[in-house]
């Protein structure tokens, strides 16, 4: 079991920070290259003529996250838990819009492509509540944790195997003391001994460059989740409590008056949340035997630096370029004429010898520099997956086959990055769904879409499902293309395709009732990025029409049978003779 004494836990935190900082050694350099020399007082000596980081982010982020995600929820127990799955689905889709989780995901997308991203999911009081109602509603919320403040077990071989995760936070000391008066779990005596601004150098806040602020009397502390520790007073996993949260801060008097290196500023408390913990980590590429992923930008930064070095060298050569004209020093008038006459002016010189006027060029870019820059740029584009077609720079020199091959290779890489990001988003929404499913303090209206689907005038989501329902029985899937950007032309084309599909399918539905048209339309809607395609067909109206047609057919058959049975023997013989006469008997 992990030693969770304050001093040992703080030493674990320091070790985790050192390991994290080794992966973020060039983080600030990448940011400086991304924003350029005109942003925020960045040193002009760090200027990158080939701003690959900006280009990669501007081309990739809109393809990864552009809109709020939508989810579909199914269950392994469709008979008994089908209604629960439908309620969680409407609750999650309403929650993504109400909290605008897209804004958090966009910031985390930049972190993911530069280094790695982290989201903290926790329960918070709902905004806009009536204090006189007597009921305090909660719902989950997501927060971006900067890579500079996140910590994870440095000896873990992967994120699920880590024995602890956590993050640094900064708050006003006065606010903590006020909260300690209300909440006895805070250790007021320890908070009073904390020195303000101690540890701020590791908080991710970089002073200077116009960010020098006066003393704010802030303190630095850490929240650490240890999943393997269960407190005696914890209700246990059966009631939604998994692991323990420790809040620790450095001891100012360590080594002088107190042998403890740190102390708990809050009593350890059971963690109420999903068994996967409060943190969700985003990354692009897996690196064996380390919890930190590899970002596509960090993987190519060596080639970016090399390309920029050669471009700077070529730029310096171009700046040193000179074009001189050498003349015979004996002819003063010739030298003056060459110097003073304007461009393209004809200067008549009697008895001019061509050897007396010699043009001379010094410096400038060489062919070798141009060739190597082009080779380095092509290598960077090849490894990063960026090509001219993505940039919109199609000159026509490449064939359609070459453009198609380049687009296919880039699509494979981008599709993998999108898949990794979407899987991390699904994990975040799974944590949100856990709170919606288990916490009875979650109450909020679902809106018009849910009202139409559920057939209720004003449906509300109410958390804390039936005890027989288990969240592990639910399966969450992101709707295809729900987070991606689509162009106006693509939307128009999809609308026309949807119209044609509905027109063809609607006419075939009554004739082939044995086909699962709803499932077929759902699959076609996923391919067209129109997840609600099946809702365009009113299945209840279709059933009514089919039943009406069947009833009409049965009524006609019954009327014909009644007419036959009502005929007298003479009428029956007369009808038979009439039929026989028609066929010539």
Name each region found by the language model:
Residues 63, 84, 278-279, 351-353, ...:
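Short, flexible segments with low predicted structural confidence
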Residues 85-89, 102, 106, 173, ...:
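Alpha-helix initiation and N-capping motif
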Residues 72-80, 280, 335, 382-386:
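Short low-complexity stretches enriched in small and charged residues
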Residues 239-342:
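Catalytic nucleotidyl-transfer cores of nucleotide-processing enzymes
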Residues 1-42, 97, 112, 120-121, ...:
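C-terminal anchoring/interaction modules
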Residues 1-242, 250-253, 258-261, 372-374, ...:
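Extended, helix-rich architectural segments
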């Amino acid at each position: 079991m992990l030693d969770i004494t304050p001093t040992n836990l703080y030493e674990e935190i320091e070790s985790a920070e050192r390991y994290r900082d080794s992966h973020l050694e060039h983080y600030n350099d990448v940011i400086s290259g991304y924003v350029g020399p005109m942003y925020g007082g960045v040193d002009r000596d760090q200027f990158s003529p080939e701003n690959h980081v900006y280009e990669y982010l501007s081309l990739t982020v809109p393809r990864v996250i552009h809109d709020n995600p939508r989810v579909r929820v199914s269950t392994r127990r469709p008979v008994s838990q089908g209604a629960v799955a439908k309620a969680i689905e409407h609750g999650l889709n309403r929650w993504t819009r109400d909290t605008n989780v897209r804004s958090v995901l966009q910031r985390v997308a930049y972190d993911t492509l530069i280094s790695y991203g982290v989201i903290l999911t926790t329960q918070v009081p709902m905004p806009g509540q009536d204090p006189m109602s007597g009921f305090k509603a909660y719902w989950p919320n997501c927060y971006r944790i900067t890579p500079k403040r996140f910590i994870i077990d440095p000896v873990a071989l992967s994120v699920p195997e880590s024995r602890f995760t956590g993050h640094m936070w900064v708050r006003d000391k006065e606010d903590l003391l006020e909260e300690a008066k209300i909440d006895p779990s805070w250790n007021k005596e320890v908070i009073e001994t904390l020195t303000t601004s101690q540890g701020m150098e590791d908080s991710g806040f970089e002073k200077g460059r116009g960010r020098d602020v006066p003393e704010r009397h802030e303190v630095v502390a850490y929240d650490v989740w240890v999943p393997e520790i269960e407190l005696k007073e914890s209700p246990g996993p059966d009631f939604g409590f998994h692991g323990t949260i420790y809040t620790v801060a450095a001891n100012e008097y360590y080594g002088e008056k107190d042998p403890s290196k740190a102390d708990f500023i809050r009593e350890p408390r059971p963690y109420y949340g999903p068994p996967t913990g409060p943190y969700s980590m985003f990354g692009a590429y897996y690196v064996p035997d380390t919890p930190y992923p590899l970002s596509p930008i960090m993987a190519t930064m060596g080639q970016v630096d090399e390309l920029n070095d050669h471009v700077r060298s070529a730029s310096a050569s171009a700046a040193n370029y000179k074009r001189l004209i050498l003349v015979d020093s004996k002819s003063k008038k010739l030298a003056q004429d060459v110097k003073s006459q304007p461009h393209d002016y004809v200067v008549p010189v009697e008895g001019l010898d061509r050897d007396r006027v010699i043009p001379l060029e010094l410096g400038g870019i060489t062919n070798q520099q141009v060739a190597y820059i082009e080779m380095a740029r092509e290598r960077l584009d090849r490894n990063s997956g960026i090509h001219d077609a993505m940039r919109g720079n199609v000159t026509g020199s490449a064939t359609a086959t070459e453009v198609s091959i380049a687009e296919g290779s880039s699509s494979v890489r981008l599709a993998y990055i999108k898949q990794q990001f979407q899987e991390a988003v699904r994990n975040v929404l799974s944590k949100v769904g856990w709170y919606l499913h288990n916490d009875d303090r979650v109450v909020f209206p679902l809106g018009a879409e849910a009202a139409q689907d559920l057939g209720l005038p004003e449906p509300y989501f109410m958390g804390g499902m039936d005890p027989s329902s288990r969240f592990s029985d639910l399966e969450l899937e992101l709707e295809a293309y729900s987070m991606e950007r689509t162009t106006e032309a693509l939307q128009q084309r999809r609308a026309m395709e949807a119209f044609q599909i509905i027109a063809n399918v609607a006419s075939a539905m009554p004739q082939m009732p044995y086909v699962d048209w709803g499932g077929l339309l759902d699959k076609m809607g996923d391919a067209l990025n129109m997840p609600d395609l099946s809702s365009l067909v009113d299945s209840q109206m279709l059933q009514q029409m089919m039943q009406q047609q069947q009833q009409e057919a049965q009524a006609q058959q019954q009327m014909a049978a009644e007419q036959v049975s009502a005929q007298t023997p003479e009428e029956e013989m007369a009808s038979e003779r009439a039929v026989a006469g028609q066929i010539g008997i």
